[in-house]
Curated annotation (Swiss-Prot):
Any Pfam family: Rad51
Protein name, as recorded: DNA repair and recombination protein RadA
Species this chain originates from: Haloquadratum walsbyi (strain DSM 16790 / HBSQ001)
Family: Belongs to the eukaryotic RecA-like protein family.
Residue spans crossing the bilayer: none
Keyword DNA damage recorded: yes
């Protein structure tokens, strides 16, 4: 939205309009979903003024009111589904990972959480007819897990039919079996994966703001951002806030971070995929003692919760633990050199 239209809001003159744009509030919708405290801190306006601006933007953008269930259903038709390319898992998820939602994948070390994020960074770039969303990925890396070589493995692991179609769409000459051709295709895929390493929790929160800017800048491009991965969501928070005395502060920061991620998903029709670490509950005498980190804050904010569990050799059990519209259940996949594959 052009800057001069922001000046139609009460209390917004040329100077305030510039401040709002510099802080990332470039549209009525972006303003409407902000909080007065957030706008006051980032755009350097008074909290009372921020409240008036936000309320006016909500009226102008028709955000924040009631709507019928039929209208919600119609709006949900715009939501995309990112396929795992594993029929059993896709069926479990009702088609794949949803845009405008947070999907949490948790599990112990070596369960395959980072494998999922890498595979989705490949799959999201596939056209819809092949289960993708035809978009780019953002990868916030807090554990130094991103490996371009793994993207190469997974790209080469696609069916030749899909690779041939990708070569044609991206105007790359050659065949799926040619190394130079596949290297050119890999370079093309890596160009649409935006990676940033998070050095601590504050930096990770800042990267969420940068991800929002990146999604905004690319929303009208040939590859809009359709996937935001955070691997892992909780590693820095867990390391920096130790003991019960710091628990409240940790949860407050984590809550804000999650809502920042959720806002990106809502504003730019992006799927948000986060991985989470686990801990063992010593008080559990029956069943699996493995519990995800993050407490109720993360449990309530994640739209879909998935538990990855090791099985024999390369087999992994994928369990859907929580979803608003789907029954709990399990599926099986294998972690191969060529990527995530069906049983």
């Amino acid at each position: 939205m052009p800057e001069d239209e922001l000046e139609d809001l009460p209390g917004v003159g040329p100077a305030t309009s510039d401040k709002l744009v510099d802080a990332g509030f470039e549209s009525y919708q972006a303003i409407a979903v902000a909080s007065p405290a957030e706008m006051s801190n980032t755009a350097d306006v008074g909290e009372s003024t921020a409240s008036d601006i936000i309320n006016a933007a909500r009226d102008a953008a028709d955000v924040g009111g009631f709507e019928t269930g039929a209208a919600v259903l119609q709006r949900r038709e715009e939501i995309g589904k990112l396929s795992w390319k594993i029929p059993e898992v896709d069926e479990l998820l009702g088609g794949g990972i949803e845009t405008q939602s947070i999907t949490e994948v948790y599990g112990e070390f070596g369960a395959g959480k980072s494998q999922v994020t890498h595979q989705m960074a490949v799959n999201v770039q596939l056209p819809p007819e092949h289960g993708g969303l035809g978009g780019a990925a953002i990868f916030v890396d807090s554990e130094d897990t991103f490996r371009p070589e793994r993207i190469d493995d997974m790209l080469r692991g696609l069916d030749d039919e899909i690779i041939t179609d990708l070569l044609e769409r991206r105007e790359i000459e050659g065949t799926p079996g040619d190394d130079e051709t596949m290297k050119a295709l890999l370079d093309s895929f890596l160009d649409h994966i935006h990676v940033a390493k998070a050095f601590n929790s504050n930096h990770q929160i800042l990267l969420a703001e940068k991800a929002k800017e990146l999604a905004r800048d690319n929303q009208d491009s040939g590859f809009p951002v359709r996937l935001l991965c955070v691997d892992s969501l909780t590693a820095h928070f867990r390391a920096e806030y130790v003991g019960r005395g710091s628990l409240a502060e940790r949860q407050q920061k984590l809550n804000k971070h999650l809502h920042d991620l959720m806002r990106i998903g809502d504003l730019y029709n992006t799927a948000v995929l986060v991985t989470n670490q686990v801990a063992s509950n010593p008080d559990s005498y029956f069943g699996d003692p493995t519990q995800p980190i993050g407490g109720n804050i993360l449990g309530h904010t994640s739209t879909f919760r998935m538990y990855l569990r090791k099985s024999k050799n390369d087999k992994r059990i994928v369990r859907l633990v929580d979803a608003p519209n789907l029954a709990d259940g399990e599926a099986v996949m294998r972690v191969k050199d060529a990527g995530l594959k069906p049983e």
